[in-house]
């Protein structure tokens, strides 16, 4: 009989609804800071989530408007978006998705190793986990966009995590929303 030894969690949209509670308002706040009249609504943002990475979303949206942004402008807007995102997290504006805390804690009690594999940056993950799991960190390690050459949906982040964990794929499960 095979027992579960490892769980690999996606973060945004799986552990917490960060996309709508933090990323979306952070994008809109950064657009406002730069004097752009852009205001992404929920349906527009959900469509933009098909594009991986915040900078890529900004660049894509720019191409579809009359305002073409330079690469430097995209980078600066994205840096400002990161600032707003971290402020939102710091102010406890994001919650765990229903049932996640209970499942994470139960797996932790049963000594099932848990890992986060995400397209978010390390600074985002560190702060979010600190805020969401106040009394403990149930995760052995994180694989973030800072750790891999090709972010998700490329399989390399998960393959990297599985290699680092040393757990066979037949004894693992992935929770992912994309």
Task: Say what each PLM segment does.
Residues 22, 53, 95-99, 120-121, ...:
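Short beta->alpha linker loops
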Residues 121-174:
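Substrate-recognition "cap/lid" segment bordering the active-site pocket of phosphatases
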Residues 30-32, 53-69:
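Helix-loop "lid/cap" segments that line or gate small-molecule binding pockets
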């Amino acid at each position: 009989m095979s027992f579960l030894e490892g769980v690999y969690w996606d973060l945004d949209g799986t552990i917490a609804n960060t996309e709508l509670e933090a990323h979306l308002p952070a994008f809109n706040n950064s657009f406002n800071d730069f004097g752009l009249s852009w205001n992404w609504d929920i349906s527009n943002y959900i469509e933009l989530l098909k594009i991986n990475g915040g900078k890529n979303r900004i660049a894509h949206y720019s191409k579809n408007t009359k305002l073409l942004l330079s690469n430097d402008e995209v980078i600066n807007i994205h840096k400002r978006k990161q600032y707003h995102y971290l402020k939102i997290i710091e102010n406890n504006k994001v919650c765990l998705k229903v049932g996640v805390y209970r499942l994470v804690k139960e797996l932790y009690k049963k000594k099932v190793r848990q890992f986060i594999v995400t397209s978010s940056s390390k600074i985002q993950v560190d702060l979010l986990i600190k805020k969401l799991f106040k009394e403990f960190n149930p995760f052995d390690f994180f694989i973030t966009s800072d750790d891999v050459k090709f972010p998700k949906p490329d399989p390399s982040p998960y393959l990297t995590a599985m290699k680092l964990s040393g757990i066979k794929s037949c004894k693992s499960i992935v929770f992912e929303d994309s």
